[in-house]
Swiss-Prot record:
GO terms for biological process: phosphoenolpyruvate-dependent sugar phosphotransferase system. It is a single-pass membrane protein. It is an enzyme of class 2 (transferase). Residues 70-152 form the PTS EIIB type-1 domain. Its main location: membrane. The phosphoenolpyruvate-dependent sugar phosphotransferase system (sugar PTS), a major carbohydrate active -transport system, catalyzes the phosphorylation of incoming sugar substrates concomitantly with their translocation across the cell membrane. It comes from Shigella flexneri. The keyword Manganese does not apply. This is Phosphotransferase enzyme IIB component GlvB. Keywords: Cell membrane, Kinase, Membrane, Phosphotransferase system, Sugar transport, Transferase, Transmembrane, Transmembrane helix, Transport. The gene is glvB. Its EC number is 2.7.1.-. The chain crosses the membrane at residues 10-32. PROSITE patterns: PTS_EIIB_TYPE_1, PTS_EIIB_TYPE_1_CYS.
Length: 161
């Protein structure tokens, strides 16, 4: 059977190599000409950690982790424009999906990255903050912060009446 289709197989290999070369040249030219951001070509600098910094970050006790998550949740809540700007919060395996009342109240993407987010996507009045696999714990902390803020508002309203 090989003898019957050898020419066809060689032709397909040649076509595949030609298209590989064509794709490489076209996409490399487009990426370099228009300075398209691809993974690894962001404007922000990547911070490299030393071995001592890595070991210090892994040496934390488990009691410090909830405090760290609470601080991260509070920072993200402030970066989103506060409790009053949030319409709804949802999450998937790695992302926080948040519907906002006013997108202009949110802070820059770099603020989210400094708070531990891997990236941010904005679309209309919705924002997706890429957190990672610990997004469910962060969501619980956000929910508790929002609930405590709302209960504090309710107490203030009842005291005013």
């Amino acid at each position: 059977m090989f003898s019957n289709h050898a020419d066809m197989m060689l032709t397909q290999i040649a076509i595949g190599l030609c298209f590989t070369l064509l794709y490489f040249v076209v996409f490399r030219t487009l990426i370099l000409q228009f300075n398209m951001c691809t993974p690894g070509r962001e404007d922000a600098e990547v911070k490299l950690y030393s071995k001592a910094e890595y070991k210090a970050s892994r040496g934390q006790t488990t009691a410090a982790e909830p405090k760290k998550e609470l601080d991260q949740a509070a920072g993200i809540l402030q970066a989103l424009g506060g409790v009053g700007n949030i319409s709804s919060i949802n999450n998937c395996a790695t992302r926080l999906r948040i519907a906002l009342h006013d997108m202009s109240q949110t802070l820059d993407d770099e603020v989210f990255k400094k708070l531990g987010a891997h990236g941010v996507f904005r679309s209309g009045d919705a924002i997706q903050v890429i957190i990672g696999l610990h997004v469910s714990q962060l969501r619980e902390q956000l929910d508790s912060l929002i609930n405590s803020h709302q209960s504090a508002e309710n107490v203030a309203i009842t005291e005013a009446v």
